[in-house]
Amino acid sequence: CGLLLLLGACEDTPEKAKTTTIHISAAASLKDTIDDVKPLFEKANPTIKLSFDFGGSGLIRERVESGAPIDGVLLASKKDADTLIKQNLAEKTKEFAGNELVLIEPKNVDQKAGMNLEQLLNDASKIAIGDPESVPAGAYAKQTLENLNLYNAEKAKLVLATDVRQVLSYVEAGNADAGFVYQTDALLSKKVQVKAKIDEKLHDPIAYYSAQVSDSDKKEETATFLDFMNTSEAQKILEKYGFKAAN
């Protein structure tokens, strides 16, 4: 019996493939896209599991700076990506998508046909924007208002949000009369309407960047996922949700 047990112990048994979980912090505007990308990537890469959190790109940058356990980032801001690179906290940054800024209002509001952006803002009593210090969409909105010489006039009306999805929810709920969000966010909601598309000349280019966190011990797996965001499969999903192709 002992001999049989010994022989059995010596037999080769197939070892189950080891899986590695990587944690990615992504801009809030990417959540629905990531919900589609995640199962597609994990099916193609069965040894890699993905874990995500979502928020404003500035807050994600601050979490990386404070040493949070993050392997990679997907940011809606070149400024935040460049800041991490300059501090040697991130590497291998790559642009993977673009977007547009729009002004939205609740769907049940009168159409206000013919009103330009300045008139729409003047008509609103509360305007939701992401906090410009931590939310790229809010920074783009502030740049727009400043370039139109409207920021000082409209500043008292601004309701600051922690990320672009909170801006969307404020307008949906009627807690703000108007709000600046990305085109992709507006497309997701049946409760809002796009009142104006913002001229791209009024703000910095809107582009999304991936980057590896330098102190991650899972760089190979992280690189595999970040590279996947530039593949045709991931780009088709981004396009489905209204994102523009990377330049």
Give the location of each predicted region.
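Bacterial Sec-type N-terminal signal peptides, specifically the leucine/valine-rich hydrophobic h-region
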Residues: L4-L7
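Exported/periplasmic ABC-transporter solute-binding proteins
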Residues: C10-P39, A44, G58, E62-S66, ...
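Short acidic/histidine-rich motifs immediately flanking catalytic phosphotransfer sites
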Residues: A68-I70
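Active-site-adjacent helical/loop segments in soluble small-molecule enzymes
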Residues: E100
